[in-house]
Amino acid sequence: MSTPFYVSPEQLMRDRADFARKGIAKGRSAIALQYADGILFVAENRSPALHKVAEIYDRMAFAAVGRYNEFENLRIAGVRLADMRGYSYDRRDVTGRALANAYAQTLGAIFSSGGEKPLEVEILVAEVGTTAADDQIYRLTYDGSIADVRGYAVMGGPAEQVADYVGEHYQEGISLAGALRLAVDALGHDSSEVRQLEPDQIEVAVLDRTRTQVRKFKRISDQTLARILSESRPDTAPSPESSAHTEETETVDGGSYESAAGTSAADDAPIAPPEDPDDNRPL
């Protein structure tokens, strides 16, 4: 009789963790940034149909990296949980903390189970408050670990390099234009060669506390994104007069751009699920 093959629990968990990390690293990075009026999400995403950032409930949003079919199932489950709780009790009872705890239990149970592979995903759950101090951002990893982060969070791809760049330049209370420029520049500094990302290569959305609608989530269109980036891009060859007023010309806080507090009916239209939910390409 042959001796059964044995793998220690420690080795099994290490192998599962390595498997999940490698899958997540194949995707592209996503960033969540707190700015003066809410929370900004910026993700490198070249697909116009497959969203990495989505609305969950009135004041809550979801961002993810990794295998699309896996985190899309988590997003749908989160929307259903939030809707059920809001309908059964009160809309104020739907909180980001409760949703993050539910996701943590699901991810942890799948990771510790030997019968199925771990999910190759990392997700962010964000809830915008009435003030910046009330904003909440929760980061959840493949093994169900949950962290309450402040200021900014980066996940997917070369997350450490992108996070280092954000950490060097991030300032509390930054404007929307400044936060967007910082996030786009950070995504371009994910390797030794600096890349210039175009509006059609990134996905941008905000949770804007200044919106009059109950739903605070809004996507930023490519046209608005291009305008904000052009206004916030520093001039590489300033004239003598403009160089004498560098601080004034580089200030974009008061720049004219489309407000995130849109009022059109299209802004509040629910995001339809993609046509091919079985697409397993890493995003």
Curated annotation (Swiss-Prot):
Residue ranges of the region described as Disordered: 228-283
One GO CC annotation:
proteasome core complex, alpha-subunit complex
Q: What start and end residues bound the annotated signal peptide? A: none
Query: Do you know which PROSITE patterns this protein is assigned to?
Result: PROTEASOME_ALPHA_2
The answer to whether UniProt assigns keyword Ribonucleoprotein to this entry is no
One BP term from GO: modification-dependent protein catabolic process
Which Pfam families does this one have? Proteasome
| Primary localization class, coarse | cytoplasm
Pathway participation: Protein degradation; proteasomal Pup-dependent pathway
According to its UniProt record, where is this protein located?
A: Cytoplasm
Q: How is its activity regulated?
A: The formation of the proteasomal ATPase ARC-20S proteasome complex, likely via the docking of the C-termini of ARC into the intersubunit pockets in the alpha-rings, may trigger opening of the gate for substrate entry. Interconversion between the open-gate and close-gate conformations leads to a dynamic regulation of the 20S proteasome proteolysis activity.
Q: Which GO terms describe its molecular function?
A: threonine-type endopeptidase activity
Name the InterPro entries for this protein.
Ntn_hydrolases_N, Proteasome_alpha, Proteasome_alpha-type, Proteasome_asu_bac, Proteasome_sua/b
Which keywords does the record carry?
Cytoplasm, Proteasome
Tell me yes or no: is S-adenosyl-L-methionine among this UniProt entry's keywords: no
Matching entries from HAMAP family are given as:
Proteasome_A_B (MF_00289_B)
Q: Which PANTHER family match?
A: PROTEASOME SUBUNIT ALPHA/BETA
Name the family. Answer: Belongs to the peptidase T1A family.
Q: How does it assemble?
A: The 20S proteasome core is composed of 14 alpha and 14 beta subunits that assemble into four stacked heptameric rings, resulting in a barrel-shaped structure. The two inner rings, each composed of seven catalytic beta subunits, are sandwiched by two outer rings, each composed of seven alpha subunits. The catalytic chamber with the active sites is on the inside of the barrel. Has a gated structure, the ends of the cylinder being occluded by the N-termini of the alpha-subunits. Is capped by the proteasome-associated ATPase, ARC.
The task this protein performs is described as: Component of the proteasome core, a large protease complex with broad specificity involved in protein degradation.
Please identify the protein, giving its name as recorded. Answer: Proteasome subunit alpha
Write down the species.
Kribbella flavida (strain DSM 17836 / JCM 10339 / NBRC 14399)
Underlying gene = prcA
